Amino acid sequence: GELIRKSAMGGYTLSYHFMDLRDEKTNIQEKTAMDKPHHLMVYITDKNNKPVLKGKVGFMIKNAQGITQKAMGMFMSEGFGTTADMKQKGVYTISSKAILGDKKLVDKFEYEIR
């Protein structure tokens, strides 16, 4: 997926990647039938640039109308990912909270769907 944000905090780097799963589909009916066609991943690395493989990550995605989706990230491909419905054009506020042992990392940013 496309790198949409990179932030550093508390000795960690968080890299967010965004992907529209509909891009992989060729059948128009499959594309329109997808409830949550967007995939959001965060890859977390420590100060030595090693991937963080244990922890919990939660996502909160709010659209321009204030409708919020909450999801726990699943560990996959050395990162934490979730699916979401971001089909409506506009600016989304994406918040993440990562619990890594005794460390808590909270991040928030905006991403526009055009």
Segments from the language model and where they lie:
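A short beta-turn/strand-edge loop motif at beta-sheet boundaries
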Residues: 49-53
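Beta-strand-rich structural segments
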Residues: 36-48
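Edge beta-strands of extracellular beta-sandwich domains
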Residues: 104-113
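Beta-strand-rich domain onsets/edges
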Residues: 1-39
